[in-house]
Amino acid sequence: MDIIFYHPTFDTQWWIEALHKAIPQARVRAWKSGDNESADYALVWHPPVEMLAGRDLKAVFALGAGVDSILSKLQAHPEMLKPSVPLFRLEDTGMGEQMQEYAVSQVLHWFRRFDDYRIQQNSSHWQPLPEYHREDFTIGILGAGVLGSKVAQSLQTWRFPLRCWSRTRKSWPGLQSFAGREELSAFLSQCRVLINLLPNTPETVGIINQQLLEKLPDGAYLLNLARGVHVVEDDLLAALDSGKVKGAMLDVFNREPLPPESPLWQHPRVTITPHVAAITRPAEAVDYISRTIAQLEKGERVCGQVDRARGY
């Protein structure tokens, strides 16, 4: 069994050694331009077209939760990957726990009005503020995949009213489910906090725009943990300036790194982190990949395969 590996920033040698330990029968090598030797599996992140084109692979593993970089290249270069080759993504591998930590900490930050107290502190102003009531602090989650379900579970512990919106209806206990474009307005109407965990697909690009933000209650909050392309940044800035949106916590952006001239950096109601809400944990990823390869070799059904038509 031959495995090729490519990631522009990961410690390649660590991955090769870890994969050797997890799959002793495999020959693992770092892919470099010009390497046209045969391979059974490819582990990749933002791979060059030539790495995958023309290969008779058993499967490709994206080394992250998203596969949009691969699918976008496939649109321009359909020869990059045969339709018959299954494409897998890392559905969790520790990312769910990280998303839970990030989302819960920020929701509580807003719920306890720490953002308002920070602004008061900046002007040396001492003034206790009225508390928010949990029953009026509905949290809405855009996207109900693996990570969305993890975030919902963690927030249920804090007894906030919860709702989700997705392509198809969910039957999660203690959570109100909305599905399809026809139910999006009703979903948004009660969301004091909107958490975005949608996949990046042609249908979701630019979905958080002026029209969507106007349907939120006045003074709502936005937490974007998915992709920067989901948000029309100028529309968000306008909503923040008008007070329609009271605060935004943004981990992802249309351009990364976020350019120094972006007005988001200096906006008093915006908090920025550099795409760190959930990162790939190498040991857990190797465990998932090795188990999945073993299942594929046995002809068993496996989880995590991407539906290329849907984009996730």
Curated annotation (Swiss-Prot):
GO terms for molecular function: glyoxylate reductase (NADPH) activity; hydroxypyruvate reductase (NADH) activity; hydroxypyruvate reductase (NADPH) activity; NAD binding. It catalyses: glycolate + NADP(+) = glyoxylate + NADPH + H(+); (R)-glycerate + NAD(+) = 3-hydroxypyruvate + NADH + H(+); (R)-glycerate + NADP(+) = 3-hydroxypyruvate + NADPH + H(+). One of its GO terms (cellular component) is cytosol. It is found in: Cytoplasm. Keywords: Cytoplasm, NAD, NADP, Oxidoreductase. The keyword Ribosomal protein does not apply. The active site is at R227, H275. SUPFAM superfamilies: NAD(P)-binding Rossmann-fold domains (SSF51735). Signal peptide: none annotated. NCBIfam families: PRK15469.1 (NF012013). This is Glyoxylate/hydroxypyruvate reductase A. It comes from Escherichia coli O81 (strain ED1a).
